[in-house]
């Protein structure tokens, strides 16, 4: 919503990074453009294993791990404990002096990680070889890593050991692929790009960024040449001023392609979590509502709120939450890279391990609905998600139907239907239903196999034939109308994304022209007709409040109950949302169009809309 310049809009724009500037028709392609094109030529072959895997382990471990989110006894509440040096403004020398003696990896730590990842159904793992503090879990021979006057040296493996090698060997011994995260940002190197952090070493004269880029290239070459075949190099941290050639991206990509031609690389040599200058995008702690069409992508997420070990963050995700997160991401065509933050000895916190063990039990039964699948053919399903393989459709049922009828908005011949984890020989009845407008109805048992997500496997003759998209009430009776399901018509009106990492939200905004409309296709199935109470989650700056709006359904409704009118209240700002009751509407069985329109606009804009919810009283 345009109220001068808003932080939410700025953050949203920062998350969209352009590709390298296209050359004029008369100019030869740049080296960067040519290198990206070479990567694209082999992408499908290199990404085949990654698209099959769908689920991997992220591991944040380093000198920040002993601190656990504390410094000198003070608790730092910020979520990312691996940033403790920044939060506490600790000089590099002091940070190294205190943390190095406390980082004491136990023998066999990597075997325990690999067992946990394998048993959870993960297929690959990525370890922080160097995080922002600049310390290396691999034994680098770069002169600055061997010895330097600031931190004494960046290598932190115990004498006679190489922690990165232990990680890679253990993962491969369990059948997982190993890859490395590498931070382009460096808080200790005197020639690194400087951020506004008190911890940065002050150096006389200007920094020589070319020296730092050579240092980065040396590190990457060591990882590529010394640790066997790697699944990925997971670069981190580009922004508006440090991205692309600021990191020497063309040479780095050429090195990767030359040394390990089968490797895949993420997109963070360039700015923006969803930019296309890599093999896969990297949304962080959020799931794009419609996936990222036209590109591969991987959500990296955490089991609590922090990536690095935090002794005070007990906000652990349970198994059900992770199972649904995985189901959601894979149904939209993405991968999940799920993080653990081991302590200074390499031990995984028990709540995290317990959750992963639970996920592993679910994957033993349902892994075929995750590994090797592609995105759902449906725009949205009221009761859950779906994935597919050739000739097979997997229905991920989050909300079990109380009447024993799972309604699927598709046509096509179903050869067989069964519930994974139930009785393997027990077939489920599945047939189109006239009462449901020709939609497929699968007769399911009275209770689910797993309340978080049960999988119904349909074997098909040919491809599923999704019916025209309609939003139906979920099994609990709620009808949710969201921004990404709407058709927006009119100048300027659009879907806004607010936030970059973590708490990313979307809303309909920039409603500058009162002639604009938002329309949703709604379906009311058999036994779902009746009165629905309507509630809108909306926001409006105080100075712009007072627009008159209508929410109406196309069709004949007795007594005019198909239309509701209301006045947009002041909520305190364009991103300060309130739930506002609009009244009740009667909806008969059938297909309808729900239309939200403005009738007047006294201020700069009409309203921001996060959702409309209809439910029976």
Region spans (language model):
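Signal peptide processing junction and immediate N-terminal pro/mature segment
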Residues: 19-26
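Short beta-strand and strand-turn-strand segments in soluble, beta-rich domains
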Residues: 574-576
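Bacterial N-terminal signal peptides that target proteins for export
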Residues: 1-9
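Mature catalytic domains of secreted/periplasmic carbohydrate-active enzymes
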Residues: 26-526, 541-555, 559-572, 584-586, ...
């Amino acid at each position: 919503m345009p109220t001068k310049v808003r932080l939410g809009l700025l953050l949203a724009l920062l998350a969209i990074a352009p590709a390298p500037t296209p050359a004029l028709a008369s100019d030869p392609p740049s080296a960067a453009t040519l290198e990206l094109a070479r990567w694209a030529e082999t992408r499908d072959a290199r990404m085949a294993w990654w698209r099959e895997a769908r689920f991997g382990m992220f591991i944040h471990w380093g000198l920040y791990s002993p601190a656990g989110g504390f410094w000198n006894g003070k608790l730092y509440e910020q979520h990312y404990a691996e940033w403790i040096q920044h939060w506490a403004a600790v000089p590099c020398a002091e940070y190294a002096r205190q943390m190095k003696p406390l980082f004491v990896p136990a023998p066999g730590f990597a075997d325990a990680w690999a067992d946990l990842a394998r048993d959870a159904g993960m297929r690959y793992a990525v370890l922080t070889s160097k995080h922002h503090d600049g310390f290396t879990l691999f034994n680098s021979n770069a002169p600055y890593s061997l010895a330097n006057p600031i931190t004494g040296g960046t290598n932190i493996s115990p004498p006679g050991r190489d922690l990165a090698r232990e990680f890679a060997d253990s993962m491969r011994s369990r059948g997982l692929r190993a890859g490395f995260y590498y931070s382009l940002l460096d808080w200790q190197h005197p020639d690194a790009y400087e951020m506004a952090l008190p911890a940065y070493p002050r150096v006389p004269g200007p920094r020589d960024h070319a020296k730092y880029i050579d240092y980065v290239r040396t590190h990457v070459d060591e990882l590529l040449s010394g640790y066997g075949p790697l699944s990925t190099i997971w670069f981190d941290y580009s922004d508006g001023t440090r991205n692309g050639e600021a990191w020497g991206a063309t040479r780095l990509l050429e090195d990767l392609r030359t040394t390990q031609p089968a490797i895949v690389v993420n997109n963070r040599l360039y700015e923006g979590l969803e930019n296309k200058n890599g093999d896969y995008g990297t949304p962080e702690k959020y799931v794009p509502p419609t996936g990222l069409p036209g590109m591969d992508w991987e959500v990296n997420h955490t089991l609590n709120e922090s990536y690095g070990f935090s002794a005070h963050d007990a906000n652990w995700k349970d198994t059900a939450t992770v199972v649904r997160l995985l189901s959601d991401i894979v149904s939209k065509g993405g991968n999940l890279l799920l993080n653990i933050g081991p302590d200074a000895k390499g031990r995984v916190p028990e709540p995290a391990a317990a959750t992963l063990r639970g996920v592993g039990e679910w994957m033993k039964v349902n892994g075929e609905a995750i590994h090797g699948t592609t995105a759902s053919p449906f725009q949205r399903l009221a009761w859950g998600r779906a994935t597919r393989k050739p000739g097979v459709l997997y229905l991920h049922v989050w909300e079990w139907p109380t009447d024993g009828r799972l309604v699927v908005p598709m046509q096509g011949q179903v050869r067989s239907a069964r519930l994974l984890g139930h009785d393997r020989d027990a077939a489920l009845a599945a047939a189109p239903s006239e009462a449901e407008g020709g939609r497929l109805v699968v007769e399911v048992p009275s209770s689910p196999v797993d309340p978080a997500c049960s999988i119904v496997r349909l074997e098909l003759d040919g491809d599923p034939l999704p019916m025209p998209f309609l939003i139906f009430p979920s099994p609990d009776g709620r009808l949710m109308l969201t921004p990404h399901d709407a058709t927006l018509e009119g100048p300027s009106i659009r879907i806004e994304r607010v936030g970059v990492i973590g708490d990313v939200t979307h809303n309909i905004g920039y409603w500058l022209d009162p002639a604009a409309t938002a329309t949703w296709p709604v379906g009311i199935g058999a036994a779902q007709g009746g009165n629905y109470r309507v509630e809108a989650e909306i926001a409006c700056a105080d100075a712009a409040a007072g627009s008159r709006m209508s929410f109406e359904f196309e069709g004949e409704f007795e007594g005019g109950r198909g239309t509701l009118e209301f006045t947009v209240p002041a909520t305190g700002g364009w991103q300060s949302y309130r739930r506002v009751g609009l009244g009740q509407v009667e909806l008969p069985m059938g297909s309808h169009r729900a239309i939200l329109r403005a009738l007047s606009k006294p201020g700069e804009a009409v309203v921001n809309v996060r959702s409309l919810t209809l439910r029976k009283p």
